[in-house]
């Protein structure tokens, strides 16, 4: 049997042994060096803090594969990023209660957020997952637009800046039984895309709120397939993708609950029924659902 190289590190090992404020790369080098030295001396490496290994605080966002994205459960079960058409006029919300399906409550101040804003936010969180909370995350607009399924054009760059600016000018309050106390934060506290002369930079910079780590927690977040989301129409289908992904075995849900959770404004149930059916069929087409049905205004789905 081939033995694993003791200096080869998994992301989970790096996260467990990293020191507060230590960059991902620095932690990997330090841990690998310590293991290599221990291997030469024949002495097994000691944990950084053996007395508190289980109680060590989470200092980074969770790690997930490149093919996936992650979001706190309360976000994907709420109307924070609603499913309305992104081209419709957006309202400004001042300390408004956001509808949440299940436990928890959210208050929000800022310009109305849609599913395209969530797509951008999800990829920003993805890029930040290897970076200590509060440190700058850098990326090029060309690569970012490609990663979220947009064409790399000046129009897309402007759309990207608009989305991040909306996320920056926010005040989000989250209250849940699992949190020791409520969280209040800006979703993107810092965003730089132009220099002092007003010219666009080749590399954009953002900073994710450190409190976001606590919001994710150890297990209270949803991972879902990124390519599936990008293949879906942006709107109700992408919202339902996140919502149903947050349940291993989704239970039946009322049409009215979907309407409120997705932040839709249509009142006629027949119109809502048609819209939900089209979105569910899109989820089946991309391979997320095996089957679905709407019976007596209850939605039943079976995940793949």
For each of these PLM feature ranges, what is it?
Residues 1-304:
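Charged, alpha-helix-forming regions
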